[in-house]
């Protein structure tokens, strides 16, 4: 690890206005941006990061939470949060989560070909956290976390009744990740097509889903770090022509 300085010369802030930027709430101001000299911490991941905590998770953040419900072939239901989760395609709508080991969720989805994703919100934060407990395969995290399973309409997997948004999904593919050198990582990316969507109508205003109304929570850096998304944090930025 080593530190080095990046110097950008002839910085002209008056030429760095951001076109199309409009804030939706009072108190948020548009400012000019200027890149200046930085004292950089540099490292190569293969040699270690040299910090108290690996910054990778904190840099690639915030990340939506993959709160995944699944059912085993014998009917046992599972609920677990995953911090590596996102959407990957519009048509068809595809979401995916990565598991850092072959866990019950992945096994269940491979066996049945189905799963549900449930939106984790501020109101459900403690319940979501409780469902992360390492328990025996036959223990239901729904019951452990005090949540209500509701049968899916398309898939045979329950969703979280208390969550304002849920997706029913069918398995697209499970991929074992690998490094640039071709070595297999102990991580599996599970991708699924969204075949049904459940939205609390209170989250919809004038025909538009309002992300902030649900107060979603998203993963930050260390094991216990999260952010809450609020309506007042939103701003709109129109793409240039």
Please tell me what each predicted stretch does:
Residues 19-22:
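N-terminal basic, low-structured, amphipathic or hydrophobic segments
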């Amino acid at each position: 690890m080593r530190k080095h300085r990046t110097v950008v010369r002839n910085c002209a802030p008056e030429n760095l206005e951001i076109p199309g930027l409009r804030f939706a709430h009072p108190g948020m101001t548009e400012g000019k941006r200027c890149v200046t000299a930085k004292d950089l911490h540099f490292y190569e991941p293969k040699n270690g990061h040299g910090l108290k905590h690996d910054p990778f998770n904190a840099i690639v953040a915030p990340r939506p939470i993959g709160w995944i419900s699944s059912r085993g072939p014998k009917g046992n239901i599972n609920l677990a949060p995953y911090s590596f989760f996102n959407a990957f395609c519009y048509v068809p709508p595809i979401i995916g989560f990565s598991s850092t080991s072959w866990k019950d969720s992945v096994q269940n989805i491979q066996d049945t070909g189905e799963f549900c994703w449930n939106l984790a919100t501020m109101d459900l934060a403690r319940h979501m956290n409780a469902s992360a407990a390492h328990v025996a395969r036959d223990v239901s995290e729904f019951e452990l976390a005090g949540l209500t399973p509701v049968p899916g309409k398309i898939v045979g997997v329950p969703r979280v009744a208390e969550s304002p948004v849920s997706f029913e999904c069918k398995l697209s593919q499970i991929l074992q990740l690998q490094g640039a050198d071709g070595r297999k990582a102990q991580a599996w990316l599970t991708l699924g097509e969204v075949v049904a969507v459940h939205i609390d109508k209170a989250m919809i205003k004038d025909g538009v889903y309002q992300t902030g109304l649900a107060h979603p929570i998203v993963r930050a850096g260390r094991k216990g770090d999260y952010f809450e998304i609020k309506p007042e944090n939103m701003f709109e930025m129109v793409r240039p022509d």
